[in-house]
Amino acid sequence: MSKLAYFAIVAAMLAANAPAAAQGLSEPKAREIIGPWYSLFNVVTRGDVKAIQEQVLTADYESCSGYLPGECWGRDTSIKVVSNFSNSIPDMKFDIKEVLVVGDRVVVRGEVTGTPAGELFGVPHTGKSFRMMAIDIQTIRDGKIAKTFHMENWLSALGQLRAK
């Protein structure tokens, strides 16, 4: 086998196993993949939480909040957590402000707004609304979200709800 043929075979094998970006994960494609996920946080217009999550999340999906080291949960728990937002923050909205694609990772900077229907994380109901920033790092595998690292500025949101 010639060196050229050998390198062509090696290059083809590497390309088949390359990260999503090398295979063409563009910002529009990333938005197409993550869009249904973020629609779930727009409580007023969202669809069936379980069906959408099963459509866009891998079976072994992990959601890692970063609030406690190593704290991650799977797709079934994520379905429950997201479903509960409709009760606690019935007008919740997630507005995507920026999307960056790096390899198989999609970084999303968003703004979350809402008005709690009752007590939220120990803060009594005040009727006030909040606005906070959220940052997510999504790992994409086979056209689905496989892992999410997310951080929301709940401290800011709770401060707004407590303000006089």
Residue ranges and their predicted role:
Residues 31, 35, 48-103, 111:
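A solvent-exposed, acidic/Ser-Thr-rich amphipathic alpha-helical stretch
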Residues 18-22:
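Sec/Tat signal peptide C-region and signal peptidase I cleavage site
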Residues 23-39:
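Short N-terminal segments immediately surrounding and downstream of signal-peptide cleavage
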Residues 114-141:
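Exposed beta-sheet edge and beta->alpha loop/turn motif
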Residues 1-8:
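Bacterial N-terminal signal peptides that target proteins for export
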